[in-house]
From Swiss-Prot:
Its main location: virion. The gene is OPG151. SUPFAM superfamilies: beta and beta-prime subunits of DNA dependent RNA-polymerase. GO terms for cellular component: DNA-directed RNA polymerase complex; virion component. It is an enzyme of class 2 (transferase). The lineage of its organism: Viruses, Varidnaviria, Bamfordvirae, Nucleocytoviricota, Pokkesviricetes. It is found in: Virion. It holds the Pfam family RNA_pol_Rpb2_7. Keywords: DNA-directed RNA polymerase, Metal-binding, Nucleotidyltransferase, Phosphoprotein, Transcription, Transferase, Virion. One of its GO terms (molecular function) is metal ion binding. Gene3D superfamilies: 2.40.50.150, 3.90.1100.10, DNA-directed RNA polymerase, subunit 2, domain 6 (2.40.270.10), RNA polymerase alpha subunit dimerisation domain (3.90.1800.10). This is DNA-directed RNA polymerase 133 kDa polypeptide. GO terms for biological process: DNA-templated transcription.
């Protein structure tokens, strides 16, 4: 019994992470990291970026400077709620204002004199409009007092015209580990990026590359385009660190394999040859000469001292305030990795590994754009001052330049899907699924152009570094995004940190490191470098590394550093480094802690009794050593046990090798995969297809469907699923519903429900079963004069319009009806005409195949009349509509049957849906049967022993055997009816019933699987996809059907099609289209005697059957499809003879000529 308790304990701890944690400010866990990211930007980071004081121009040896100062940054929230924004048809934005002062500083003997040039106090209501992220319950980070709407999970932006926008998270291009590349045999590069800390603004980027060619070891250089000299890295390290070449040799050779030591010796010897080739070599003189040569090459206007200071001071911006000696030791540690990677590439994190990447969240998007646009804004001011001084001789700035920062356009482009000239960051949220609001903000994708340029084809595979942090099921199955977009698992999140918190945390960690004995943290020759965000701070005694890391992790969990998401990674395997990561954009998730071979949750006896009353933050405070937040880099270089069960089966010595233990399998799925049931009981592809279909399921009504003029599909009578997982419940996907419970029967019905075809009951449809309502936006722009023109002849298209020229509310629009008046008029140049004014209707018509009711009409009057109309339509299931279960058993309505046509059980109950029974075996979806069994068992006992309603927990991925669920169903039926016989009980457990034929009223020979299941309706609707028609609009030029389904278009028969029919004949053309393609065409030889296909032996076609009989038949060449040839071969292999016979008739071109009589006609 203890084993079961322990296995439940890790599951309960995992559930604690998923539920809200108000004490820690977590009200909605799935999107909490996005809320924090955006809140950090708009409350803190925006002020840091916009608050600027820096020189624009300098003159006279820097004694005169033009300065710019931006201050008084204020961010004001909107006065209305998101629902009011929807009613008004406006965006939901915050207003940012600031004050700009431009002045001239002149250095005099008395001091600095300041002369004002220009200023602007930004009070414009449109200066900077920042789209506000709507959080859980319609909250926003600027005004947390907004009322809560429980079913609104947020995570979206409301763009102009009240269109919701939502986007994925992009993988940052800059890597935290240097990128190793084999250029050609024996030629390698090691490139890395250096980015200044978040407190340094504007952010400085430097990109460096170390090159090595085995044939030219003297050219082991480090370089950077226009920002650094090209120099031998060994000599640069010596220059910065002030150590000897022998010191560098010992440092590079320490704890390295023999082959690497040999290469190190060769490299140091080559560096010595450089020094020996120069008379009286001095390292300072050598570097100064290279700097002077670079100064001349770049034709810099700076003095040589300023140029040298700029180049060397800004070298490695991420170590900006670090002494040069530590920079030199950092270069030595990089060189160690480079040389080791040459021989052991597979042990080094490759460029596709998520260990090397940070992730851009919503706040980071806006932060990057704000930083870039501010630099453009300041650059425009600088250019305007220079132009005015050049043309007018005065230092002045045009007011238009001051009042147009450019951020509005950048933010608008961001919400339109363009982030720094690359697509894929944002997309419009489709309103048919609640899961899209969760799945898209939790998706992580690569830049599309990054994949094309860098040729990162291997990234499309499931990378080992994604294990546990990403869902392996919820990935695109087809299209250009395959392998480029991944879904976070339910326990994963992305870190965020304020600049002030970053600096405090860095200070505390440095103080902790320096609390060690000085000699123990100064092992720069043979020690383990300690880096904080890649910045070297110390080098630890190798004998102390295990104690240091263990103590650091314990202090971190106890809150010693004030941040529980710090990552500490011990990199062994000869690379020898301790990496401490504290920055934003890291993937983190909780793990169970293993300390000295003991699972720490076992040594806390009070935890189990107190767990129900505690939140996740309470566990971290009161039991700090039970759970640890681990980033993906620390996880990759740690020993992690797969499950608690496997950990307990190990010996004590084996347990001591592990650092962490994982939670059960259900926590490795994403939130979309968690909406499925028992995917580990099905075949693998069903999980991927199930996730794609679950995101296409139509869900319940949104809170402001009648206010928001936007496209949407909504389920009319949703039901909460009975069989759920904990993630489905805590994410509120279950509460917001995305389907209905229906009664299904697995059987064949008159041969109609073949393949994906399903039979659906007519009365079920009439009662509102899986009924939906479609909201559709229609938008037209009409010239003002056209809108004011009156129609001369009454048009049927204007029958639904009122006198004001707009469509009536509650009018039912049909195909061809106009939504607003649009009459174009023209004057004829005819003096004899009585009325030279002609007018004609150019209005846009309603084109859908179904009638819709007008719900709302909005009009904006500018230079044009912009009319937006919202139409609503209730749409019941019809032939061709698609449905699915949560196990990816997709079905298409093949027949709508009356209740009298369907089989019934002993109680007269008929199934709502009949599904082809063979689909279970072909698709191997055993969990669909389990879901029906559990749902039926719930109906027998819907309450627990305390009288509380309890849904059935059936996680998407679980380690529970099927027998356990059968036992659960057995107990439910025995509780409600203990007198059942064994056969009756077995039939109820396995949902087997005797059904009766509706035509004969006789029972079927075998029992039928019959029970309830949660059924989903997909957004693929027949009437939205129908495009082909015989009658309709025609183009004026060619008098054929126009193109496009929205315009009522059809198939056009063009000139090329006409010419083919005329020249080739209709029959031959159809044959070519259907058969004679390059991929399908095949020539075969057929024996005219026996009808077999001839075999080719040594290049000679032979009929095997006739050759054995010593016959010499005639072989005739025919053209056929490859599929036909394979079919005949397969049939022959199964003993079925298919004879190809030829029609015997005289040839049409070689028949005997008719006799011609040449006698004169009068003699005949």
């Amino acid at each position: 019994m203890k084993k079961n308790t322990d296995s439940e304990m890790d599951q309960r701890l995992g559930y604690k992470f998923l539920v809200p944690d108000p004490k820690a400010g977590v009200f909605y866990r799935p999107l909490h990291f996005q809320y924090v990211s955006y809140s950090n930007f708009i409350l803190h980071r925006l002020h840091e970026i916009l608050t600027v004081k820096r020189p624009l121009l300098s003159f006279k040896n820097n004694t005169e400077r033009i300065m710019i100062e931006i201050s008084n940054v204020k961010v004001t929230p909107p006065d209305y709620s998101p629902i009011i924004a929807s009613i008004k048809g406006k965006s939901y934005d915050a207003l940012a204002t600031f004050t700009v002062n431009i002045f001239k500083e002149v250095m005099t003997k008395e001091g600095i004199s300041i002369t004002k040039i220009s200023s602007y106090e930004g009070k414009d209501s449109h200066l900077i409009k920042i789209p506000l992220l709507i959080g859980y319950g319609n909250k926003n980070p600027l005004d947390t007092a907004k009322y809560l709407v429980p079913n609104v999970i947020g995570g979206v932006f409301i763009n102009k015209q009240s269109v919701e926008k939502v986007g994925i998270n992009l993988v940052e291009k800059i890597t935290t580990w240097p990128k190793f590349r084999v250029v050609k045999p024996n030629s390698f590069t090691f490139s890395f990026s250096s980015v200044s800390p978040p407190n340094v603004l504007p952010t400085r980027y430097r990109h460096y590359k170390i090159s090595l060619d085995i044939s030219q070891l003297e050219a082991l250089n480090i370089s950077s385009t226009k920002t650094f000299i090209t120099v031998n890295i060994v000599l640069l390290s010596q220059y910065l660190s002030r150590v000897s070449l022998e010191f560098i040799r010992r440092s590079l050779s320490y704890d390295m394999p023999p082959e690497v030591v040999y290469l190190v010796n060769a490299i140091i010897d080559s560096a010595k040859r450089i020094t020996e080739s120069i008379t009286d070599f001095n390292i300072d003189t050598y570097i100064n000469d290279l700097v002077e040569a670079e100064h001349i090459k770049q034709k810099s206007q700076l003095t040589i001292n300023e140029f040298k200071y700029e180049m060397l001071h800004n070298f490695l911006p991420h170590m900006n305030y670090t002494p040069d000696q530590l920079k030199g030791f950092y270069m030595i540690s990089l060189l160690r990795k480079f040389l080791y990677c040459i021989y052991h590439t597979s042990r080094y994190p490759d460029r596709d590994s998520m260990v090397c990447h940070r992730i851009l969240t919503y706040g980071k998007y806006f932060e990057t754009l704000a930083h870039d646009e501010l630099e453009n804004y300041i650059g425009n001011i600088r250019n305007d001052i220079m132009n005015n001084h050049k043309n007018r001789g005065t230092y002045a700035v045009n007011i238009h330049v001051l009042t147009t920062p450019g951020l509005n356009h950048a933010f608008s482009s961001l919400l339109s899907g363009k982030f720094k000239k690359s697509d894929g960051s944002y997309r419009t949220h489709p309103h048919y699924s609640w899961m899209q609001n969760i799945s898209i903000p939790r998706s992580v994708g690569f830049y599309p152009d990054q994949v094309k340029i860098s040729k990162m084809f291997s990234v499309r595979k499931y990378h080992p570094s994604q294990y546990l942090y990403f869902c392996s099921s919820d990935v695109p199955e087809r299209g250009p995004q395959v392998g480029l977009v991944s879904q976070l698992s339910v326990l994963s999140s992305i870190t965020n940190i304020l600049t002030s918190e970053y600096l405090d945390l860095e200070k505390k960690i440095c103080e902790y490191i320096r609390s060690y004995y000085k000699d123990d943290i100064s092992y720069f020759e043979t020690g383990f470098p300690i880096t904080i965000e890649n910045a070297l701070v110390a080098s630890l005694n190798p004998n102390m590394i295990c104690d240091f890391v263990t103590d650091f992790r314990r202090r971190k969990r106890m809150g010693f550093f004030g941040n529980l998401e710090v990552g500490i990674t011990l990199v062994r395997d000869h690379m020898n480094e301790i990496r401490i990561n504290i920055g934003a954009g890291r993937l983190v998730r909780p793990f169970l802690v293993v300390d000295n071979g003991e699972l720490m949750m076992d040594v806390c006896p009070e935890l189990e009794s107190r767990l129900d009353d505690m939140t996740f933050s309470d566990i971290q405070k009161e039991f700090p050593h039970v759970i640890e937040m681990v980033d993906i880099e620390q996880f990759t270089f740690s020993n992690v046990c797969e499950s608690v069960q496997k950990f307990r089966m190990m010996s004590k010595d084996e347990r001591k090798q592990y650092d962490l233990c994982d939670f059960p399998a259900e926590f490795r799925d994403g939130y979309v995969a968690s909406s499925l049931v028992g995917i580990n009981h099905n075949s693998g592809p069903r999980a991927i297809l199930g996730c794609a279909q679950a995101k296409q399921a139509i869900s319940c009504l949104s809170s402001d469907i009648r206010n928001k003029i936007d496209n949407g599909i909504h389920l009319m009578y949703p039901e909460r699923p009975i069989v759920i997982s904990k993630a489905l419940e805590t994410s509120k996907i279950a509460a917001n519903c995305f389907g209905q419970h229906v009664t299904i029967a697995l059987m064949s019905y008159k041969g109609i429900n073949q393949e994906d075809g399903i039979i659906i009951k007519k009365q079920f449809i009439q009662r509102g079963g899986l009924d939906i309502v479609t909201a559709k936006k229609h938008q037209v722009e009409i010239p003002l004069e056209n809108f004011n023109n009156k129609e001369r002849d009454r048009s049927n298209a204007y029958s639904k319009l009122e006198s004001n020229g707009l469509v009536r509310l509650n009018a039912f629009l049909e195909s061809g009806d106009a939504m607003a008046r649009n009459i174009s008029s023209r004057t004829l140049e005819d003096d004899f005409a009585r009325d030279n004014q002609i007018s004609f209707d150019v209005s846009e018509k309603y084109t859908d195949m179904y009638k819709s009711r007008v719900e709302r009409v909005q009009v904006e009057l500018t230079d044009k009349v912009k009319v937006r109309v919202l139409t609503m339509k209730e749409r019941r299931p019809i032939l061709g509509d698609k449905f699915t279960t949560r196990t990816s058993q997709k079905g298409t309505v093949a027949y709508v049957a009356d209740e009298t046509e369907l089989p019934y059980d002993e109680n007269g109950i008929t199934p709502d849906v009949i599904i082809n029974s063979t689909s279970i075996f072909s698709r191997k979806t055993i969990s669909m049967l389990i879901e029906v069994i559990l749902t039926a068992a719930y109906s027998a006992k819907p309450y627990n022993n305390k009288g509380e309603n309890r849904p059935v927990c059936f996680p998407s991925s679980n380690e529970t055997s099927i027998d356990t669920y059968m036992q659960f169903a057995k107990q439910c039926y025995e509780h409600s009816n203990p007198k059942l016989s064994d056969e009756e009980l077995s039939d109820k457990i396995f949902c087997e019933k005797i059904l009766y034929d509706p035509e004969t009223d006789k029972p079927y020979a075998s029992k039928v699987f019959f029970g309830p299941i949660y059924y989903l309706r997909l957004r693929h609707l027949t009437q939205d996809k129908a495009t082909v028609r015989c009658r309709g609009k025609k183009t004026k030029l060619i008098r054929q059907a126009n193109e496009g389904r929205k315009r009522g278009g059809g198939i056009k028969f063009g000139e090329m099609e006409r010419d083919c029919l005329i020249a080739h004949g209709a029959a031959n053309t159809i044959t070519e289209v259907l058969k004679d393609s390059e991929e399908d065409y095949q020539d075969v030889y057929v024996c005219e005697n026996c009808g077999d296909i001839a075999a080719q032996i040594k290049g000679i076609n032979t009929c095997l059957r006739c050759s054995k009989l010593n016959l010499s038949p005639l072989l005739t060449k025919i053209d056929t499809t490859h599929v036909s040839k394979v079919f005949l071969t397969q049939m022959n292999a199964r003993g079925v003879k298919v004879k190809l016979d030829f029609e015997r008739r005289p040839p049409s071109f070689y028949k005997p000529l008719d006799k011609v009589d040449l006698k004169p006609s009068f003699l005949v």
